[in-house]
UniProtKB/Swiss-Prot annotation:
InterPro entries: NADH-Q_OxRdtase_suN/2, ND/Mrp_TM. It is found in: Cell inner membrane. NDH-1 shuttles electrons from NADH, via FMN and iron-sulfur (Fe-S) centers, to quinones in the respiratory chain. The immediate electron acceptor for the enzyme in this species is believed to be ubiquinone. Couples the redox reaction to proton translocation (for every two electrons transferred, four hydrogen ions are translocated across the cytoplasmic membrane), and thus conserves the redox energy in a proton gradient. One of its GO terms (molecular function) is quinone binding. GO terms for cellular component: plasma membrane. Its main location: membrane. Belongs to the complex I subunit 2 family. It is a multi-pass membrane protein. Keywords: Cell inner membrane, Cell membrane, Membrane, NAD, Quinone, Translocase, Transmembrane, Transmembrane helix, Transport, Ubiquinone. It catalyses: a quinone + NADH + 5 H(+)(in) = a quinol + NAD(+) + 4 H(+)(out). It comes from Tolumonas auensis (strain DSM 9187 / NBRC 110442 / TA 4). This is NADH-quinone oxidoreductase subunit N. The chain crosses the membrane at residues 6-26, 37-57, 66-86, 105-125, 127-147, 159-179, 204-224, 239-259, 271-291, 299-319, 329-349, 377-397, 408-430, 452-472. PANTHER family: NADH DEHYDROGENASE.
Amino acid sequence: MSFNSVLFIAELPLLLTALTAIAVMLSIAWQRNHKQVFYITVIGLNAALFSLLPASSATPVTVTPLLIVDSYSVFYSALILIGSLATVTLARAWLKKFPDNREEFYLLLSLASTGAMVMAQAHHLAAIFIGVELMSLPLFGLVGYAFRQRRSLEAAVKYMVLSASATAFLLFGIALIYAQVGSLDIATIGAQISRLPQAESAHITLLIVGLGMVVIGFGFKLSLVPFHLWTPDVYQGAPAPVTTYLATVSKIAVFAVLLRLFYTIPATDSFFYSLLGGLAFISIIIGNLLALLQSNLKRLLGFSSTAHFGYLLVALIACRLGSLSQEAVALYLVMYLLTSVGSFGVVSLMSSPYQERDADELPAYRGLFWRRPILTSAMTIMFLSLAGIPMTLGFIGKFYILAVGIQFHLWWLTGAVVFGSAVGLYYYLRVISILYLKTPGMPSRDATNDWALTTGGFMVLTSAILVVLLGIYPQPLLDLLPLAQLATP
């Protein structure tokens, strides 16, 4: 078999991510050294990120019957690697004083990132399942990494049990699709469905049931209503850096799969897309209303995440109607990645594994501006962006989602987005106001002078700067959005 340089370049990012996990494993076996393992992970993930550049210039390459490397997979792989690198930088500060083994954290994270990249490249249901499991299994260990804390162990058990249930739905849905179509290749499934006689209602019904079960499986990963019940407890119990990963990388990978799946497979029945619309509607409304009631920052951001992916479902429903919807998804996910990394990054920088819990209760942030003004400014920018305030990237993202809803006459969903944004504005501004309240006897400063020079501090500040700069001048990001478009099936 001859060496194929095109295939090698196309798969180099995935190979480097997998090799990073192997290198970390060998380093742990040879000698436990937290600093060394951290640098191996950072170098490996950065190498994988930069290796995406030559892969993006190539035409779509079908590497195996399971994986395809195109501009779409390259774009979402870049988001996955950026989110993984952000988690690593936050984890280093959090793990410095961790009383138990620290190196395995980077091994589990590298394995989960490998699974997420497999999902971004998958165009076969078997590859999707492999990617989901390769990402999910390490996350069980990461969620329960602070195993001496009861909340962390409880969160890990809940996530494991409910994730196994979601996997069962996903597998059963894949089995029903295969039984009706006779293939697991996404493109073949789309072609076969388009040729099915509409008169064969039994075939269409079973296909809808199969696709519905796939949506249930992915709905759990995206914490959509009514599959969101795990989110507040797991977000609250998991270590702060792991919560960052759960909220960003794992959800971006799943949504990339959903978009490819429903763009390739034609609409089989209007009822199915009405069902997706219903999921979007209740996720937006209930997610925002539940966030309104929270006094814990992690739980608030967890329910807020449910609402944000409800907004994204609006664009997903219209994905076959025009390129604007795909651009809206890509832009909104970039915004969501930067703002979530920044907001959870602040929680991570405020937390310590020696504490009984992370610094996630809102009273812990009362008057934070008078103690840590720069950190508070970064957090304020993140929440203003999540609320969709002008001059931030969040405003551009919300504008694109509303434009999709209006252009394709999704009026009831557009109304839900407007209502959800209004409710979100209230609870985001409530958190911001708490940051600036001053109480008598409060110390003027309690932060070290060099916190912003640490890797985690630098990452939070960089995210805040990008959110503002891209909110004022989004053209560089808009120029990249065509990369995130799928080819017409």
